[in-house]
Amino acid sequence: MLTGKLIHPDIMAALALCGHGDKVLIADGNYPLDSKSGQAETVYLGLTPGLPTVTDVLQAIQSAVNIEKAEVMDPADGTTPEIFGQFQSMLGGMELSKLGRYEFYDACCQPGVRLAISTGEKRTFANLLVTIGVA
């Protein structure tokens, strides 16, 4: 039996193939994963509305890899979603790079995005693109 926090076999396999600088998208339930994740390995985790959350998945991912950068989709109206503060807290105060909606979509379609995970997250703008750091 596995004893770590991350036990999903497809996510573990995809992360094992990642190297420094590769990226992982953790998407909310509203994100158009099929059309806006390029050639990334896709994993659909949404079980029910709200489960799992993006922060649940981030916590599991952090138990397996180091994260050196985080990018978020910034609302056009200039508001800051509450979840951005949660991301920063979970990432040790790391500054979030804010991208406009279409800029974020473009970033998620780049070849370096190796894994895209869809969640049941209901909060809007709860999408997170993380860059894997060194071990």
Regions found by a protein language model. Name each.
Residues 36-69:
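A phosphate-binding glycine/aspartate-rich beta-alpha loop in the early core of alpha/beta enzymes
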Residues 4-5, 61, 134-135:
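Conserved phosphate- and dinucleotide-binding cores of soluble alpha/beta proteins
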Residues 19-22, 39-40, 67, 111-113, ...:
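Short coil/turn connectors at secondary-structure junctions
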Residues 1-2, 45, 70-77, 114-115:
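Flexible, glycine/proline-enriched loop segments at strand-loop-helix junctions
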Residues 74, 79-135:
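Glycine-rich, aromatic-bearing surface loops/beta-hairpins
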Residues 2, 6, 10, 19, ...:
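Conserved active-site and cofactor/substrate-binding residues in soluble primary-metabolism enzymes
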Residues 1-40, 44-47:
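Long, hydrophobic N-terminal alpha-helical segment
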